Amino acid sequence: MNRFNQLVATALIGLSGAASAASAPHWVASWQASPQPVWGADFLFPSLIPASLHDHTFRQTARISLGGPRLRVRLSNAYGTQPLRIGGASVAPQAGATPHQLRFDGRPEVLIGPGQERLSDPLPLAVQDRQALQVSVFVPESTPLQTFHWDGRQTSWIAPGDQSLARELDRASATTARLFLTGIEVEAPTSARSVVVIGDSITDGATASLDRDQRWTDHLAARLAPQGVAVVSAGISGGRLLRDGMGEAALARFQRDALDQPGVSSVIVLIGINDISWPGTAFARKQARPTLAELQAGYRALAGQAHRRGVRIVGATLPPFAGALPGTPLDDYYQPDKDALRSQLNAWLRTDGPFDAVIDLDAALRDPADPSRMAAAYDSGDHLHPGDAGNRAMAEAVDLDALLGGQGSEPFSHGEGL
């Protein structure tokens, strides 16, 4: 081959590779529910699910952030000790609509090994931004339930038999926990990306109105969808930064629940209040409270992981919580010395923390007349969790340019890059 022909061949190979890369689908995380290990009957809170299912269908609603021409669904057996057999699964574009069968390597059923998860094959179902989908999963054999998401803030249903392709369920019972489904990804333009919010019950939406998508991450998703940015929640009620709580510690699950999400470009960290306040309560009677230095080291570790992956990481100050959880088994959750540690941590986050930017949620939610308390207009009533108005105020307190690194101010078109 002469020199000219070599150059032509090289150019053609390069063009072929570029075309292949350009045609590869760009997947973005559009919805998430972080998995948790199921706890025993002796725990402070009921699990809200049966110990096992056998020949049952589980149906749940998930409002995605961004839409696209195709989607795929992630099912999890993260904490299972035996294989999870799925006999069928489907997605319906809305409640009462005809479900579309999901496939896994071309088959309607799938076996998920212990500690594993599986992505479905891409489903050619065009969905819109902020669309509420219904996902159904059928388990044909006796299946101990060992992985769930406890605080779904959404009604789900358990029905006998294989009803995964039924428009309406027959003889269904309700729960607010989630099973099997941990993520929905959409095919999107190459400019689309996602923001993951890792946190505890405040991010999980513990007191948000049921079935109304009023978590603070829902409000943030509504702000960012027009810019082609999805928001997915990695909140776990009872979650902690340094130690396992009602789920793995944020340090342990950060890669899985945040950095490994497709299309992630920024992460928001709002976690730590349970680290400060659980010790000495019914949750952790004999545990020592972490020091300021230990909490700082935990935040630095998260920031280091994110930066090594080229992901922007934004911290959030811990909101006020004076008088939290009155009249409950956790009415000692708040103590003045715990609040002093929160204030020290917030001061450090504002001035010397390891994050690329900081969202001052403490300032956004506090009562100006009593800064240790949440403003009444934002308080759900338990003095720890914001209500719907408080969740909206949190989302509105986010500087989008700071969150996205100044790369998210242009309107977004779904036709771009597909």
Task: Label each PLM-derived region with a short phrase.
Residues 16-20:
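N-terminal signal peptide c-region/cleavage motif recognized by signal peptidases
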Residues 251, 277, 319-412:
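Catalytic His-Asp segment of secreted/periplasmic serine-dependent ester chemistry enzymes
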Residues 3, 21-198, 208-211, 405-407, ...:
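N-terminal secretory targeting modules
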Residues 31, 52-60, 75, 83, ...:
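Conserved SGNH/GDSL esterase-like catalytic core that processes O-acyl groups on lipids
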Residues 267-270, 313-317:
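Short beta-strand segments at enzyme active-site cores
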Residues 1-8:
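Bacterial N-terminal signal peptides that target proteins for export
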Residues 198-200, 316, 359:
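Active-site flanking residues adjacent to catalytic metal/cofactor-binding acidic residues
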